[in-house]
Amino acid sequence: MPADGIRARFRVDYAGFALDVDLTLPGHGVTALFGHSGSGKTTLLRCVAGLERAAEARLEINGELWQDSAAGVFLPTHRRALGYVFQEASLFPHLSVRRNLEYGMKRVDAASRQVSWERVLELLGIGHLLERLPGRLSGGERQRVGIARALLTSPRLLLMDEPLAALDLKRKNEILPYLERLHDELDIPMLFVSHLPDEVARLADHVVLLDQGRVTAQGSLQDIMARLDLPTAFHEDAGVVIESVVAEHDDHYHLTRLAFPGGAVLVARRPEAPGQRLRLRVHARDVSLANSRIEDSSITNVLPATVREVVEADTPAHVLVRLEAEGTPLIARITRRSCDQLGIAPGRRMWAQIKAVALLG
């Protein structure tokens, strides 16, 4: 295994459930552990944290051995350089935000600190909250403080167990940009547990799919989201993720052109400067197909693409079509009738009409 990777082998047996995984993961970026409730996501995270004693285990983090059952090596949780963020921030209610954060810093001597106090406050936007008690914080503010406390331990690995699950939509949207900043600006690998495709699409670089304690698939976010043989393809939010670059702005029509391998799309004017990267989400339900380009249409974003795969959808009336536009994958959810009428089959050249594009971040 390369020194900058994460190797995790765990076997845990409970009555009625067993976790059995053997993973080699990137030692950087965000790896999402994705699956339905009871699939083993949290159990795997607890194993990594040393909170579960697996019958068989080996854990290596960027070249540092934390656990090896065969060799009798077990680093206890308090000696593992990790931060753990739970669904609800476990803050000391009688201590101010400042003192809660200072508690996290006490775990690390000054010489070993990799993330400064000032940097954490700025990244998470909590400087104005320092003198408040936890009871006077909103749900989103509490989670940001909990994440800050984890970061102030200068972790080599950050574990996040559905940190947005307890938040309503407004608070979730409030905290997501801060999580994106952590992803973009800190060189700390993260394991992020979620059961929501849109959360994974927004934050992850790598995805591990779990089901009944087993790994069913893993790979880059783009590859996993484009596969039709996985449960993600049949979710109502199914679709692909595209990494794009701001190409230019059209000040007359107040539009921005976002370019990627295989084409470009126009979206409402963005504030980002040309050259800045943006992640796009194109849902399968927002892609229609045509055998020829329709010029007199209000649909602006149309790409030439080749059909790679056609499979049955979750209803007998629909099919899922995977296409490729010069290396960029797309998925379309269309009726079986349209599929037959258009003669859609692997290898066929078509025009993919994108009715909507979601900007992630």
From Swiss-Prot:
Residues 296-361 form the Mop domain. PROSITE patterns: ABC_TRANSPORTER_1 (PS00211), ABC_TRANSPORTER_2 (PS50893), MODC (PS51241), MOP (PS51866). ATP binds at G35, H36, S37, G38, S39, G40, K41, T42. It is found in: Cell inner membrane. It is a peripheral membrane protein. InterPro entries: AAA+_ATPase, ABC_transporter-like_ATP-bd, ABC_transporter-like_CS, Mo/tungstate-bd_C_term_dom, ModC_ABC_ATP-bd, Molybdenum_import_ModC, Mop_domain, P-loop_NTPase. It is an enzyme of class 7 (translocase). Its EC number is 7.3.2.5. It catalyses: molybdate(out) + ATP + H2O = molybdate(in) + ADP + phosphate + H(+). One of its GO terms (molecular function) is ABC-type molybdate transporter activity. The keyword Membrane applies. Its main location: membrane. Residues 1-237 form the ABC transporter domain. GO terms for cellular component: plasma membrane. Keywords: ATP-binding, Cell inner membrane, Cell membrane, Membrane, Molybdenum, Nucleotide-binding, Translocase, Transport. The keyword GTP-binding does not apply. Disulfide bonds: none annotated. Belongs to the ABC transporter superfamily. Molybdate importer (TC 3.A.1.8) family. The complex is composed of two ATP-binding proteins (ModC), two transmembrane proteins (ModB) and a solute-binding protein (ModA). PANTHER family: ABC TRANSPORTER I FAMILY MEMBER 10, MOLYBDENUM IMPORT ATP-BINDING PROTEIN MODC 2. Part of the ABC transporter complex ModABC involved in molybdenum import. Responsible for energy coupling to the transport system. This is Molybdenum import ATP-binding protein ModC 1. It comes from Azotobacter vinelandii. The gene is modC1.
